[in-house]
């Protein structure tokens, strides 16, 4: 399993940042590893909504269907994608502050089957992938990365 967690402080109000993050169609705007994202089930974000997210992969792009499995409006949600080869669990939490909010993005990626043997390599690559996504998120939220102890 590979895990990446980041904390981004933003001047945006918490409800605005949450709405932006909860609409998974925005992933392609800030995550350079995502080429397309479309909602396939539900009417807007919320528990049970599903999104097809196309990610860069070798040898060809991979479409992952993310379902929102946990939802606490304006606070936190979890989106899960599962296939025969992997499981991705992304939890986004938004905490308000006087000067905006902190967005915490916690991503876990688990390879399945024979691909699980590549877990050590995945851990190394996932850090670099996460750093690029964090840079895009900082730009999208007009924010800055903050240490884990200061969300």
Question: What label would you give each PLM region?
Answer:
Residues 6-8, 39, 64-70, 81, ...:
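Hydrophobic/aromatic beta-strand elements that line small-molecule binding cavities or substrate pockets
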Residues 80-132, 149:
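Beta-strand/loop substructures that line and gate deep hydrophobic ligand-binding cavities in soluble
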Residues 1-41, 150-151:
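Hydrophobic ligand-binding cavity/cleft-lining segments
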Residues 38-85, 102, 132-151:
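Glycine-rich portal/gate segments that line the openings of hydrophobic small-molecule binding cavities
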Residues 15-18, 131, 135:
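Amphipathic alpha-helical segments that line or abut small-molecule/effector binding pockets
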């Amino acid at each position: 399993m590979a895990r990446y967690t980041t904390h981004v402080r933003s001047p945006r109000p918490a409800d605005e940042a949450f709405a932006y993050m909860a609409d998974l169609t925005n992933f392609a705007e800030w995550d350079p590893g995502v080429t397309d994202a479309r909602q396939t089930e539900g009417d807007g974000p919320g528990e049970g909504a599903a999104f097809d997210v196309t990610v860069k992969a070798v040898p060809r792009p991979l479409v992952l269907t993310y379902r929102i499995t946990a939802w606490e409006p304006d606070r936190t949600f979890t989106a899960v994608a599962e296939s025969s080869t992997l499981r991705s669990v992304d939890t986004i939490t938004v905490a308000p502050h006087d000067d905006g909010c902190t967005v915490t993005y916690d991503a876990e990626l688990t390879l399945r089957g024979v691909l699980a043997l590549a877990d050590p390599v995945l851990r190394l690559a996932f850090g670099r992938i996460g750093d690029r996504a964090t840079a895009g998120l900082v730009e999208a939220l007009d924010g800055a990365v903050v240490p884990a102890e200061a969300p």
